[in-house]
A protein has these predicted regions:
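Terminal leader/tail segments of proteins
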Residues: 1-9, 13-126
Length: 126
């Protein structure tokens, strides 16, 4: 069973991710964003970043491609309703393809509990 992690931007639910991938030693989880009722994720993030002065690392308006540093107002919630703790989430993607979130600063304790499947997979590779 996959776990859905709810994403909110400035207090508004925008969708979820399943955090399909992780780099446990680095405290990073990442995955595809599934948007709910968002016509243009590019416009959503571009407007948000301009409004809140969040640094954009790549912006190609013609392709509607954007990448950002950590967005402080982007919150991730666990199934129990608690907010995922860490440094925060950055996004990248384009409207015609997909968007991904990379969440950094996950503690080793949280990696061992919430993301134990990723930790197990990592340990089996060594």
């Amino acid at each position: 069973m996959r776990i859905k992690y709810i994403l909110e931007l400035d207090g508004v639910k925008i969708g979820y991710t399943e955090f399909e991938y992780a780099d446990p030693p680095m405290g990073v989880v990442h995955g595809k964003i599934i948007f709910e009722e968002i016509d243009s994720p590019y416009d959503l993030f571009k407007n948000h970043c301009k409004k809140f002065n969040v640094e954009i690392t790549a912006d190609l308006p013609k392709d509607q491609l954007i990448a950002t540093y950590i967005i402080p107002q982007l919150k991730v919630f666990l199934q129990n309703g608690n907010q995922l703790q860490g440094w925060g989430g950055a996004i990248e993607g384009m409207d015609s393809d997909e968007f991904k979130i990379e969440f950094s600063g996950v503690s080793s304790e949280l990696m061992q509990t919430e993301f134990r499947h990723h930790l197990k997979k990592y340990n089996e590779q060594e």
